[in-house]
């Protein structure tokens, strides 16, 4: 009981596409099913904790390498399936797929309910165009969303280039 046995998952978005034809970022029925799936996982780990007297938890896995490996294997075994194996990787955990265009607010609203179900670990990522170091309001907006939606952990990714030799900075790619 000195540690935690974590049960993680990747590819919820692709699983939902397979089951209902859309992922949770684009469809309320898919969101409802996604929450049911992860709630089931949480309930099971709670049962395991009680039964085996060990600490179990569900974690929203950030597994870029594994997500690619699973997709390659599934593509080999099942072929090219639109919306599922037609990309190079599965989406991390309960994230809205990066290719799906939606606002940061919509992404937060969709992903936030999973944070309470994945107490073993989770993260909310926001991609911001350009250099956010000169736009602190963009960062504060993300912090406000975390508070509003009761998110446990978040990160803001933004484009910033800096030469370590001369110190030149820009936000061009």
Enumerate the language-model features and the residues they cover.
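Long, C-terminal-biased catalytic regions of enzyme "large/alpha" subunits
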Residues: 1-173
């Amino acid at each position: 009981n000195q540690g935690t046995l974590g049960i993680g998952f990747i590819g919820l978005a692709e699983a939902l596409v397979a089951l209902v034809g859309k992922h949770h970022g684009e469809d309320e029925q898919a969101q409802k099913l996604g929450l049911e799936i992860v709630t089931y996982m949480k309930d099971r780990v709670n049962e395991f904790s009680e039964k085996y007297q060990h600490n179990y938890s569900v974690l929203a896995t950030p597994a870029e390498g594994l997500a690619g490996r699973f997709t390659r294997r599934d593509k080999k075994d099942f072929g090219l399936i639109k919306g599922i194996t037609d990309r190079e990787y599965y989406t991390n955990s309960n994230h809205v797929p990066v290719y799906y265009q939606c606002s940061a607010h919509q992404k937060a609203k969709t992903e936030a309910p999973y944070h309470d179900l994945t107490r073993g670990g989770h993260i909310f990522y926001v991609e911001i165009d350009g250099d956010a170091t000169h736009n602190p309001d963009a960062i504060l907006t993300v912090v406000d969303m975390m508070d509003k939606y009761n998110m446990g952990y978040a990160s803001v990714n933004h484009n910033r280039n800096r030469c370590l030799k001369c110190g030149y900075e820009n936000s061009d790619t």
